[in-house]
Structures are given as structure tokens and as C-alpha cells.
């Protein structure tokens, strides 16, 4: 047992050295938010990353909690082509749940476990300037990222804080916009030239049949979309990953957030447990 523990630490050591002082943007969502054990493990992982000298930044989702709050208030959620139709009343609920509830719960748990977390949203310091998303027709106050102003994030991480970001952006029209958390995380990672973007999902990574693909280049990832290997909800995640890598992010990891300590297992081990997308070295 003791030798096993030593071996785990020795395996992690070169990665701890390599990533010391580097910025990781982590999208927290899916199973990791719904399962209590996974939620607790996520908090522990973030604290451990921080204590090994990594600078973690969290971007979180919260779709199921938004739908539940709407139902509790007697409002039936409406979806169009898989996207939430967000009228003014729905946007108020989105902001209330993401910014006022989920964000503060994550911040509280990080701080209770020895972190120094600060909760913000994309409206703070105009972190995320948004514009209306029209690709899927008019679905209300659903936005896409027009610009990221990362100065507030630099200020927080340079002063040893862990930023926790709710993906609600501000439009130049003064409206709040609900932004997909994967997209927000990718754009923030690009603005910071982050070492890594980690997307927590409900599956083990990119699959070919039932087999996990451990590593991909952006070109290979795009080919898997074209040939139909990557389908459904994994398509936008892979597209986010490709965009991030081509935008200067060192690597993107798509991993199963329902697996306890998934982040540590992916980052600090040779084999990893998910899919890593990065450019070929050299």
C-alpha cells in the first residue's frame, strides 16, 4: 500500500513540475455537478491543483438547475433545436440560478476546503461581451461571445484567488445573455493563452464505437465530426476544443466528470482517463 502511494506521487511529480505556475481553465458541469461524491472530489481536485502551483479558473454551467427552478416557479422550459428559449423572464431565472445560487455554492465549498475563491459572472468588469446568437433562429437572450476582457482574471489569479465564473455575458445593448458554458470556457482560455482547458462531461471522452480515443490533433478531431464518429452533444464540445487549441491553448481535455478525481487522474498520470486534443509537437 505504501509503495503504491509512493509510485503515484512519483508518477505525478514531472507533471507537477511542468505545470507549476500555469493557468488551467476548467468547465464544471454535467455529472460532476449532480453527484455529491463527484462534486466533493471536484472541489478537492481544484484545491490540490492550487496547492501544486497551478492557477485554476472555473467556468460552470447549470442547465438542469435552471429547468428545475423554472418548474418550481410554474414556468415550463421551452427548447428549440436543443437550445433553451430564453425570454426576459427566463433570463432573470437563468441569472438568479447561475450567478446567485450555483456560483456561490461553488465559491463557498472551495473556501471551506482551504481555497480563496471569488465568484463573478461575465458582466463583471465586462469580462464577457456578448451578442445575440442567431444561428438557431430567434431564441431570445442566448448569446455568443463577442469579446473577452481578461484583466479582472489576471488581477484575481495574480493575487492568489480562484475565479469562479458564471457564463452570463453583457451585450452592448445592455442586456444580459446566457452563454453556453463550454463556449465561454474556451473563449476565456484563449484570451489567457491557458496551458489547458478541461471540459467535464457525462462520458469518458471522444469515443469510436465504445473505445476511448486518448489523443487527437485538431485536424483528426474535425475529421471525426465529418465522418460521423462524433455525434450529438459531443460535436459542440469537440468544436470548442479545436477552436481553443487553434487559438493558442496548450491542450484541451474532455473527461468524465462523474468519475471521482477525474481531473487529477487525467493531468497527473501518464495514461490519463479521457481524450486530449492538442497540436503535434515539433
From Swiss-Prot:
Its EC number is 2.7.2.8. GO terms for cellular component: cytoplasm. The record marks 27, 237 as: Transition state stabilizer. It is found in: Cytoplasm. InterPro entries: AceGlu_kinase-like_sf, AcgluKinase_fam, ArgB, Asp/Glu/Uridylate_kinase, Glu/AcGlu_kinase, NAGK-C. It catalyses: N-acetyl-L-glutamate + ATP = N-acetyl-L-glutamyl 5-phosphate + ADP. GO terms for biological process: arginine biosynthetic process via ornithine; L-arginine biosynthetic process. Keywords: Amino-acid biosynthesis, Arginine biosynthesis, ATP-binding, Cytoplasm, Kinase, Nucleotide-binding, Transferase. It holds the Pfam family AA_kinase. Pathway: Amino-acid biosynthesis; L-arginine biosynthesis; N(2)-acetyl-L-ornithine from L-glutamate: step 2/4. PANTHER family: N-ACETYLGLUTAMATE SYNTHASE, N-ACETYLGLUTAMATE SYNTHASE, MITOCHONDRIAL. Belongs to the acetylglutamate kinase family. ArgB subfamily. HAMAP family: ArgB (MF_00082). Catalyzes the ATP-dependent phosphorylation of N-acetyl-L-glutamate. This is Acetylglutamate kinase. The gene is argB.
